[in-house]
């Protein structure tokens, strides 16, 4: 890790209180992290954003990297259909991952993951960029392109954000469906989004219970009217035996087999600031 102290060492648990002990450990940022906080005076920041919102958000946007800058921060000519950063070109995956992987931050931790069984995985920005690029190439090899929709129905694994970022990398629109949703809920979201590819796991663990995610996907896809899904990518999480389909209208693939020979280099799609990034369905709450 680039810093003298690792990211893990910066997470210091506070002294347990009776309330905290009953629920969860509370982590207090180190004094170094607090000193480097981006907002030192919340009230002053809020007043500045209210007084001059366009200038405020332009200042925030200047913290990102753009292929082309905007001609107008906010276009209000067709309310309520506002347009932000008119004419600007960017890619959120580049800003979230690539620009860090190209600097000394490539060795800093991007993710610290802990499973339900307390197993851990650590992934640096450099490693994350490599995995995102490889999966982006996997998607492209299956015909996914800019503007296409991809449904992601997975457990809480690192491959979930990798899939999301890979979609953003190539301009595909991802739709994350909560892994606890039913067959009917998943089917409805696939139909509505018109996804042609689903990314899932063989299974997931929630509160000690195994969830048959792959079986739920299978049940959602074999329906009348048929869904537009042509390909399913399965990440091996639980090790449970699942049926892999190879039919004229649908083919299933193992994540690890596709990733094995995928190139770690992938060109980033240039996106308009108003291009859609994802589709997120409310459950009605």
Q: Where are the regions a protein language model picked out?
A:
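Short, contiguous pre-domain boundary segments
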Residues: 19-44
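A short N-terminal helical cap/helix-turn-helix that marks the beginning
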Residues: 48-71, 88-110
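Active-site diphosphate/adenylate-binding microenvironment
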Residues: 67-89, 156
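Conserved AMP-binding/adenylate-forming core of the ANL superfamily
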Residues: 93-94, 107-165, 182, 186-187, ...
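Conserved pre-ATP/AMP-binding loop-to-beta segment of ANL
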Residues: 107-109, 230-235, 246-281
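Conserved adenylation A10 loop of the ANL superfamily
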Residues: 118, 279-285
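Conserved G/P- and acidic residue-centered "switch" motifs that form tight phosphate/ATP-binding loops
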Residues: 150, 171, 285
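Structural core segment of the AMP-binding/adenylate-forming
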Residues: 165, 169-257
């Amino acid at each position: 890790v680039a810093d003298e102290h690792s990211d893990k060492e910066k997470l210091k648990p506070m002294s347990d209180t009776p309330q905290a002990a009953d629920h969860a450990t509370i982590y207090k940022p180190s004094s170094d992290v607090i000193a480097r906080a981006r907002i030192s005076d919340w009230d002053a920041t809020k007043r500045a954003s209210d007084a001059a919102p366009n200038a405020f958000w332009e200042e925030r946007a200047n913290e990102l990297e753009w292929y082309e800058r905007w001609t107008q921060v906010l276009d209000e000519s067709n309310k309520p259909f506002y347009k932000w950063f008119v004419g600007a070109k960017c890619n959120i995956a580049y800003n979230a991952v690539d620009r860090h992987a190209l600097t000394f931050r490539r060795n800093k931790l991007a993710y610290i993951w802990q499973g339900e069984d307390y197993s851990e995985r650590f992934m640096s920005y450099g490693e994350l960029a490599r995995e995102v690029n490889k999966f982006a190439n996997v998607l492209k090899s299956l015909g996914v392109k800019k503007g296409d929709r991809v449904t992601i129905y997975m457990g809480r694994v690192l491959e979930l954000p990798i899939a999301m970022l890979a979609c953003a990398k190539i301009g595909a629109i991802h739709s994350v469906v909560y892994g606890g949703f039913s067959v009917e809920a998943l089917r409805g979201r696939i139909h509505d989004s018109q996804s042609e590819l689903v990314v899932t796991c063989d299974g997931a663990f929630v509160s000690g219970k195994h969830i048959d995610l792959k079986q739920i996907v299978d049940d959602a896809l074999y329906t009348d009217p048929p869904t537009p899904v042509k390909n399913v990518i399965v990440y091996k999480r639980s090790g449970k035996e699942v049926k892999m389909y190879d039919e004229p209208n649908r083919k299933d693939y193992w994540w690890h087999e596709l990733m094995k020979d995928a190139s770690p280099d992938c060109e980033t799609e240039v996106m308009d600031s108003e291009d859609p990034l994802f589709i997120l369905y409310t459950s009605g709450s």
